């Protein structure tokens, strides 16, 4: 069974590039283009891993992260922040809000895939805890 990923970014080109490559890698991919849509997809599709941009319309990535951690406690799902904001404050805030990994754009596909594989490798350990 393929792992389910949710890619959340308001840049349609980035989303489509990621989706195409991740599907080729064998993942099941759902996409969202803003924070509100992301929360609906988390509830509907129950993804295993979320790739989340910070700067988006409607709800930003921090708001989405907070909502997921407060309201979807039934399942631990790794959240990887993929953001153009490489500022130390954004990185610190992400980790303090329980993001699991942070990648600064521009980021290579190899680094994204490595981050996803690392987070997936932790899922069984988290389920046992």
Identify the residue ranges that each predicted region occupies:
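Charged docking surfaces used in two-component/phosphorelay signaling
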Residues: 16-24
């Amino acid at each position: 069974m393929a792992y389910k990923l949710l890619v959340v970014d308001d840049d349609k080109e980035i989303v489509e590039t990621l989706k195409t490559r991740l599907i080729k890698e064998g993942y099941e991919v759902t996409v969202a283009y803003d924070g509100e849509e992301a929360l609906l997809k988390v509830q509907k599709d129950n993804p295993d891993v979320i790739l989340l941009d910070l700067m988006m319309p409607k709800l930003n990535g921090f708001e989405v992260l907070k909502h997921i951690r407060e309201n979807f406690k039934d399942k631990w799902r790794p959240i990887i922040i993929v953001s153009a904001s490489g500022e130390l404050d954004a990185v610190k805030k992400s980790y303090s809000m329980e993001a699991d990994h942070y990648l600064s754009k521009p980021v290579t596909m190899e680094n994204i895939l490595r981050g996803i594989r690392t987070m997936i490798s932790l899922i069984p350990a988290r389920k046992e805890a």
